[in-house]
Amino acid sequence: MPEVLRGGNHAEIEAWRTRQSLERTLTKRPDLFQQTPPTPDEQRLLDKIRRDRSRPQLVEPPVCRIATEDDLPAILAIVQQARNYLCRHRVDQWQGAYPNEETFRADIAAGTCHVLTYQGAVAAVFTLTFAPEPAYDALTDGRWRSDREHAAVLHRNAVSANWRGTGLSDLLMQEVERLARESGAHAVRVDTHRHNGAQKKLLERHGYRFCGNILCDEPGRDPRRQAFEKLLK
């Protein structure tokens, strides 16, 4: 059963059913759209379906490895693409200087920055740390589900615009959990902007639960973040 049907969100279920219906018609009887023109909302969804179908498909698994300084140009390009995406969707996250080259140089030096490569090219990036996160100790409006000493923390994850919609972000989350387990973590924590719908859907899809709110250090921007956690079994 698709995960959306288990969630019980009627609006999401209805949107999923509408998309399924349009995809079937587009595949088997596209002529029906001439007989009964789609509504404006259906047309926008059809345009998105066509864009998704035109995207390249992953034909082999990506490779996850620790990033090196040679990866910096590709990492910074991916971050800029993510920054542009967030700007278009009016999400006040990564809209200032953070994260920048110094941020990722520090991550690389610490051995916490990882990349996913596909057919030899960097396609995604994330940082995974295992030290207690001071900002997370000041969680409000909720509580963590695990103790801080045994939690991994996901930071700065982004996927190349060339590979959005291909499932690469889901593979990234699988690698995050694999690395966390191998390091002995009992949980993975992460935070994101409350308006970052794409990231929140990704987290929910992988079983992360909202735990409360924190304040991040992103000078000149909205510091409020929603915090999520997944217990590793």
Predicted regions span which residues?
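Conserved acetyl-CoA-binding loop-helix of GNAT-fold acetyltransferases
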Residues: V159, G165-R178, K201-R205
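Conserved catalytic-core motifs of GNAT/GCN5-like acyltransferases
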Residues: D191, E204-R225
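Conserved GNAT acetyl-CoA-binding A-motif
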Residues: M173, A180-T192
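A short beta-loop-alpha structural element at the N-terminal edge
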Residues: V63-A77
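Conserved beta-strand-loop-alpha-helix junction that forms the acyl-donor binding cleft
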Residues: R164, V190-K200, E218-P219
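Conserved GNAT-fold acetyl-CoA-binding loop/helix
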Residues: R83-T103
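Conserved acyl-donor/pantetheine-binding loop and adjacent beta-alpha core of acyl/acetyltransferases
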Residues: T127-R164, E218-P219
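Conserved active-site alpha-helix within GNAT-family acetyltransferase domains
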Residues: D170, E182, R194-G212
